[in-house]
């Protein structure tokens, strides 16, 4: 077999994802690293739950991105995409949830949110530690004001049906525009305020 000549990303596919209302979802977790040496990582209690807009079907065509992927940019124009109310009121049918809404959903379904978020924190920490030598090396070479700099990360985590967490993507300096909806604005505004 020949290797493709164009750029590609190879990523493990979670075959039995945890579903909510039949939809695949991920959790955007925000972290802040304020020191590479010694390592200092902060987890923010804000974040987003982002849903695929099509019902999950493991046999769906792999090119049906609205079934398999939860990325906002790929789902926002789908007719099934549901924004929260202008006043910020959230509903189960929305395509994005806040962490507090997600926690209430978990509790109402007899799922322990504390245990789940410990699992998420565990895999996020491992992912950041896995890349830390590269981050520390870059930081030492490129950052002249090491004691006054920081880096924000947005990590996308998916859960399987057994509540095991997997980091699917790590984003450096994730988008903070918050212009899509009230939920984005509220979460990202608070996040940026806390960073400063």
Predicted features and spans:
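Catalytic core of tubulin tyrosine ligase-like
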Residues: 1-151, 159-166, 182, 186-195
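Glycine-rich phosphate/pyrophosphate-binding beta-alpha loops
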Residues: 171-179
């Amino acid at each position: 077999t020949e290797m493709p000549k164009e750029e590609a990303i190879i990523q493990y596919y979670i075959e039995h994802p945890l579903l909510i209302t039949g939809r695949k979802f991920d959790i955007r977790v925000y972290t802040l690293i304020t020191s590479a040496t010694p390592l200092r990582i902060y987890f923010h209690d804000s974040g987003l739950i982002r849903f695929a807009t099509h019902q999950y079907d493991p046999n769906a065509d792999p090119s049906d991105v609205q079934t398999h992927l939860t990325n906002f940019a790929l789902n926002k124009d789908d007719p099934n995409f549901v924004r929260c109310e202008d006043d910020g009121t959230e509903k189960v049918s929305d395509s994005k949830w806040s962490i507090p809404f997600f926690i209430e959903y978990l509790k109402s379904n007899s799922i322990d949110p504390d245990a789940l978020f410990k699992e998420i924190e565990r895999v996020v920490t491992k992912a950041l530690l896995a890349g830390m030598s590269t981050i520390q090396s870059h930081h030492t070479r490129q950052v002249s004001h090491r004691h006054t700099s920081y880096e924000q990360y947005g990590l996308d985590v998916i859960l399987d049906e057994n509540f095991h967490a997997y980091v699917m993507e790590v984003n450096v300096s994730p988008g903070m525009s918050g212009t899509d909806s009230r939920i984005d604005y509220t979460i990202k505004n608070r996040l940026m305020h806390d960073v400063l």
